[in-house]
Design a protein with these regions (language model features):
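Conserved Rossmann-like nucleotide-cofactor binding loop
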Residues: 14
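Glycine/small-residue-rich loop that forms an oxyanion/phosphate-binding "nest" at active or ligand-binding sites
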Residues: 68-70, 74-110, 115
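Anionic-ligand binding region
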Residues: 124-129
Length: 136
């Protein structure tokens, strides 16, 4: 087993919910959490600024020698370029896929409301993933 910690970041403290869930399902894993409370919220910023902040957050976690990075931030998850994520030296995931899957699994009438920051909604990422999951 890889002894390195899992890295989790958010634009604030909301990602601590993800950390709590990780601790529940992976009790033996160490976790490094970075909450960027100095620049919260990310969602009112432009795309380039959000990506710049995400890069800085990721660099910080990589400096802590993490084995996996989770962006527990809907804004970063919907804005960070997938091609950049693919080039990282460790696996990277965000929250869009898991959140969209939970919404699709929970709906009874195939109607899902999306509440998010301006940047998250503007990205269209949740709508795209949800539509792909329900095959509309």
């Amino acid at each position: 087993m890889d002894p390195r910690p899992i890295g989790v970041f958010d634009s604030g403290l909301g990602g601590l919910t993800a950390v709590r869930q990780l601790r529940r399902v992976l009790p033996g894993e160490d976790i490094v959490y970075f909450g960027d409370t100095g620049r919260v919220p990310y969602g009112s910023r432009g795309r380039d600024t959000i990506v710049q902040y995400a890069r800085q957050d990721i660099r910080f976690l990589l400096s802590r020698d993490v084995k996996f990075i989770i962006a527990a931030c809907g804004t970063v998850s919907s804005t960070y370029p997938p091609e950049e994520a693919a080039r990282l030296p460790v696996p990277f995931t965000g929250v869009v896929g898991a959140t969209a899957r939970a919404a699709v699994d929970a709906t009874r009438n195939r109607k899902i409301g999306i509440i998010g920051t301006a940047a998250t909604v503007r990205s269209g990422s949740y709508a795209a993933v949800i539509l792909s999951l329900i095959h509309i």
